[in-house]
């Protein structure tokens, strides 16, 4: 911290930090005051969190203004942990504590024996340390092996031996994570995974604001905001959160996935690493939209377990892999910029298959097959959104006559365009469309998009190697059908 801050208890008393308004203020009151100030100034409440302005954020604000402990319920990849970590932006820039205290003792009201003795012995000369907001945030992932000692504390025989203390001395306590979060925020992720007997240990903290250390007749009056996260399936169906603990959680806030493709694209653009340190990257809007729609299609696919959710990380890692495949091609061909294509989305299948949990029917088909279907449906939806007036019958008929087209994802934009030019009318259609064709790279992306739409509608086929050809259904005289999706 800066040298201008008081270094002793006496100096602290004479500073603004020793005023009646600041002295003894709880962390919940601190968060409340800073939140009200931010609302009044019109500043973003939780920087970097998008899409919750009209849903989650108002509920979060109400919980904090009410000084509630709260829980965020949501599927994976819904920014729950990010929201909790953003709470530190509502803390004061600096907090005075007694130097050397394990539990962030307030010099005006120390809760530990160490802190009380330090103030009694040194008085106004008691040294003061200053904590930054990040130092006041303690996060723990709940797992079945977490014990009460981990969270609350326990006897430390080694500390007793080294200090020459009796085992009954309060100085022999090894404090757990909760006491170490005193005057701060304690976040517990995946609360249902915490054993029931450990959840019981949180009762006193949430209701009376204190903890009792096993084997010691002492109470620590903790000042802490408790924030939890959980999966709705665990929280409701499995019943892993014991009822008395549920009753003590002041507010229950539901998170959700982005409601629109545009919003999801903004989140992915913010989070994905696309600005590489070599060649410049030009990401076509079509590719970005198809990449994002893959996640939307996955969330509507009945062969994917929707109880597990489809994380926003799918879109983020998928886009990063798409750019990487395009980067590999650009470097190998000596191109001046990196321009991803739809073929690069197929090359990024590992970013999809690892993030979807399949139902039994999906397991029979395989994740890779379903992932390819998701890409095709995403491309079809993108084309329909951008230009649903295109007549593709001539192109389909050309393939129906037994023609085929293979364009490698390793080919340059010029070579790929020449390949697509062999399909009668294809380049003319994309040039006259609303797809924004300005150069060879744009033309290749537009041609891919136009061909992917009839593949999704099963009027054409696309092999794993990327060869377009006649649909198997049309080959046998069967009418094409659109793949089923869950509404």
Name each model feature, range by range:
Residues 292-296:
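Acidic-glycine-rich active-site phosphate/pyrophosphate-binding loop
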């Amino acid at each position: 911290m800066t040298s201008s801050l008081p270094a002793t208890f006496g100096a602290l008393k004479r500073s603004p930090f020793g005023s009646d308004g600041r002295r003894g203020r709880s962390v919940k009151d601190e968060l409340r005051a800073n939140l009200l100030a931010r609302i009044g100034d019109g500043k973003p409440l939780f920087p970097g969190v998008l899409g919750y302005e009209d849903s989650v954020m108002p509920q979060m604000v109400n919980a904090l203004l009410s000084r509630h402990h709260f829980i965020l319920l949501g599927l994976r990849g819904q920014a729950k942990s990010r929201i909790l970590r953003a709470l530190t932006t509502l803390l004061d820039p600096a907090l005075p504590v007694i130097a050397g205290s394990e539990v962030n003792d307030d010099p005006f009201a120390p809760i530990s024996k160490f802190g009380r003795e330090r103030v009694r012995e040194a008085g106004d000369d008691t040294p003061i340390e200053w904590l930054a907001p990040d130092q006041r945030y303690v996060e723990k992932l709940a797992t079945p092996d977490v014990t009460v000692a981990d969270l609350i504390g326990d006897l430390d025989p080694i500390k007793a031996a080294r200090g020459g203390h009796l085992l009954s001395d309060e100085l022999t306590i090894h404090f757990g994570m909760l006491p170490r979060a005193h005057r701060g925020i304690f976040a517990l992720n995946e609360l249902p995974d915490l054993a029931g007997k450990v959840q019981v240990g949180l009762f006193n903290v949430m209701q009376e604001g204190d903890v009792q250390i096993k084997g010691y007749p002492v109470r620590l009056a903790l000042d802490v905001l408790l924030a939890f996260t959980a999966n709705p399936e665990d929280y409701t169906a499995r019943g892993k959160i014991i009822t008395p603990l549920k009753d003590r959680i002041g507010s229950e806030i539901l998170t959700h996935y982005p409601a629109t493709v545009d919003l999801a694209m903004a989140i992915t653009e913010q989070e994905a690493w696309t600005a590489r340190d070599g060649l410049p990257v030009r990401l076509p809007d079509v590719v970005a939209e198809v990449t994002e729609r893959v996640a939307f299609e996955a969330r509507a696919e009945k062969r994917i377990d929707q109880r597990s959710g489809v994380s926003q990380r799918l879109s983020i890692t998928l886009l990063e892999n798409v750019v990487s495949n395009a980067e590999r091609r650009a470097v190998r061909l000596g191109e001046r910029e990196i321009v991803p294509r739809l073929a690069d989305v197929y090359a990024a299948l590992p970013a999809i298959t690892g993030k979807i949990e399949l139902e039994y029917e999906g397991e029979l088909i395989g994740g890779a097959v379903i992932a390819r279907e998701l890409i095709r449906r995403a491309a079809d939806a993108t084309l329909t959104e951008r230009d649903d007036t295109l007549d593709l019958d001539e192109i389909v008929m050309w393939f129906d006559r037994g023609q085929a087209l293979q364009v490698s994802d390793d080919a340059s934009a010029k070579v790929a365009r020449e390949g697509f030019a062999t399909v009668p009318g294809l380049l003319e259609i994309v040039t006259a469309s609303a797809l924004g064709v300005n150069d060879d790279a744009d033309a290749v992306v537009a041609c891919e998009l136009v061909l992917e739409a009839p593949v999704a509608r099963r009027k054409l086929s696309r092999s794993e190697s990327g060869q377009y050809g006649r649909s198997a259904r049309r080959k046998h005289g069967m009418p094409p059908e659109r793949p089923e999706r869950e509404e």
